[in-house]
């Protein structure tokens, strides 16, 4: 039952916490030469957790053991993946499997699109560096992976995998820390999208507490679906980094939800792990066809968003340029000697988010460029940001991306950790429509939790990047 003795986090406490994290971030900047990039990342974890605490619904009700357990598990997963050779090799094998999936998808793409889907033939026609056509090389992977996942779901293979890892995570957290439903959803989000994963717990969504709903939403925003993972890998992202950040996000989303909105009620699924068995298809063939259709709708959605958002960026940049020219004209008329800087959306994002990139452990020289990508990811979407990130990784050998230009390799890899997630403004509407359809009675709660979920999902990817920044060579 709710704790009636608590009235929420006091305004003075919030002010002190905000002041504290600003001082912490400033200190990290001034001592950057002494602490190095790993030290920056350590400060970053404290900064991001402090920001979550400052935005907490009620700090007095936070179960700090749950927070410590989740952070410890997240760090342990990062340590195992990045520092233990056997585990790292295992993730490399999984990355190779995903890459093989890309090859299978390319076979289908070449049948439909012909030479356009063949990198070598496309370069011969369009010139060196122009062989990778995003719409016919990367996006068809979504259709194929969606079909495979639909078959795995129909055969209950995906549910079994999710159940196993959810059970393990619940044992680590303890039944008092998190509920079965939110743990299942957090695990499902590693493999599935933010509107597909909740299907695993569909019967329980209507009765979830506010804290559980927030965990469900954060889990969706802190990760990407299997199909999108494959697309990012096809665009040149390191498979190990993509897989690692998705796995690390599962415990992170859970403990951040308990920090932002502490659990004060008794969840219906306390200590229980039960997967909903709802199958929409009659057989495997029907599942494959349905999955392919769903994947096609996602591909069309991605194409539409990229066209709209990238065109929108060009429009906004043009308006900002005209505004800057007008201001400089007025300044010159008045007789002042200085000139107003040429504004662009990229310039604004780089200034606003470069401190965040710095606190992830990114080198200070690269922070403005990575900060620009973080801003695009949060305000626009992850595809726009990843498309720009790909521009920094355009050298290809044997149809594979190699090398990075313009920034350090370390900064590039940390950006992958931070950008792999659905945490952007449009995801609030996507979740409101998708999860709200499963439990119409909770639509108002979902709407009220939207901005907190966005914050939690964004912080989860930043903390993932910071942990990688500590562990990465």
Model-flagged regions — what are they?
Residues 170-233, 284, 371-467:
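Alpha-helical membrane segments and immediately flanking helix-loop junctions
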Residues 34-46, 137, 343-344, 416-424:
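Structural signature of hydrophobic alpha-helical transmembrane segments
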Residues 35-41, 67, 71, 75, ...:
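Interfacial/capping segments of alpha-helical transmembrane domains
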Residues 293-402:
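Transmembrane helical segments that form the transport core of multi-pass membrane transport proteins
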Residues 16-29, 45-55, 70-82, 142-151, ...:
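Hydrophobic core segments of alpha-helical transmembrane domains in multi-pass membrane transport
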Residues 44, 87, 156-158, 274-290, ...:
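Short, membrane-interfacial amphipathic segments enriched in basic
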Residues 247-298:
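Long, contiguous bundles of hydrophobic transmembrane helices that form the permeation core
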Residues 94-95, 99-170:
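Hydrophobic alpha-helical hairpins/lids featuring a short glycine-rich hinge
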């Amino acid at each position: 039952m709710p704790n009636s003795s608590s009235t929420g986090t006091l305004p003075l406490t919030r002010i002190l916490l905000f002041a504290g994290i600003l001082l912490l971030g400033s200190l990290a900047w001034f001592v950057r030469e002494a602490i190095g990039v790993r030290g920056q990342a350590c400060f970053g974890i404290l900064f991001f957790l402090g920001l979550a605490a400052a935005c907490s619904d009620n700090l007095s009700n936070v179960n700090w053991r749950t927070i410590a357990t989740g952070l410890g598990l997240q760090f342990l997963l990062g340590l195992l993946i990045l520092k233990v050779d056997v585990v790292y090799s295992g993730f490399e094998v999984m990355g190779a499997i995903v890459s093989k999936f890309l090859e299978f998808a390319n076979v289908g793409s070449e049948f439909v699109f012909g030479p356009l889907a063949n990198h070598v033939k496309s370069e011969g026609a369009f010139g060196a560096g122009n062989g990778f056509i995003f719409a016919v090389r990367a996006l068809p992977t979504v259709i194929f992976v969606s079909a495979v996942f639909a078959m795995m779901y129909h055969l209950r293979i995906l549910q079994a995998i999710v159940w196993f890892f959810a059970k393990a995570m619940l044992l680590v957290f303890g039944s008092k820390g998190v509920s079965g439903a939110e743990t299942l959803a957090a695990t499902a989000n590693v493999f599935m999208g933010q509107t597909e994963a909740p299907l695993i717990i569909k019967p329980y969504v209507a009765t979830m507490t506010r804290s559980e709903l927030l965990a469900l939403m954060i889990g969706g925003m802190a990760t990407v679906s299997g199909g999108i993972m494959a697309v990012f890998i096809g665009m040149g992202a390191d498979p190990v980094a993509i897989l690692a950040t998705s796995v690390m996000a599962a415990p992170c989303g859970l403990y951040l939800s308990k920090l932002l909105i502490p659990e004060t009620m008794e969840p219906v699924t306390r200590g229980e792990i039960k997967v909903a068995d709802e199958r929409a298809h009659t057989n495997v063939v029907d599942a494959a066809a349905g999955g392919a259709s769903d994947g096609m709708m996602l591909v069309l959605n991605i194409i539409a968003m990229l066209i709209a958002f990238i065109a929108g960026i060009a429009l906004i940049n043009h308006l900002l340029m005209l505004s800057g020219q007008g201001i400089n004209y007025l300044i010159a008329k008045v007789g002042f000697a200085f000139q107003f800087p040429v504004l662009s959306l990229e310039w604004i994002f780089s200034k606003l988010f470069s401190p965040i990139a710095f606190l992830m452990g990114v080198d200070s020289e690269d922070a403005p460029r990575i900060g620009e990508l973080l801003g695009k990811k949060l305000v626009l979407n992850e595809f726009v940001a990843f498309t720009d990130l790909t521009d920094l990784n355009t050298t290809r050998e044997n149809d594979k991306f190699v090398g990075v230009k313009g920034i350090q390799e370390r900064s590039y890899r940390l950006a992958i950790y931070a950008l792999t997630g659905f945490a952007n403004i449009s995801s609030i509407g996507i979740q409101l429509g998708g999860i709200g359809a499963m439990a119409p009675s909770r639509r108002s709660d979902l709407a009220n939790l939207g901005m907190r979920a966005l914050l939690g999902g964004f912080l989860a990817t930043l903390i993932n990047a910071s942990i990688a920044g500590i562990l990465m060579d």
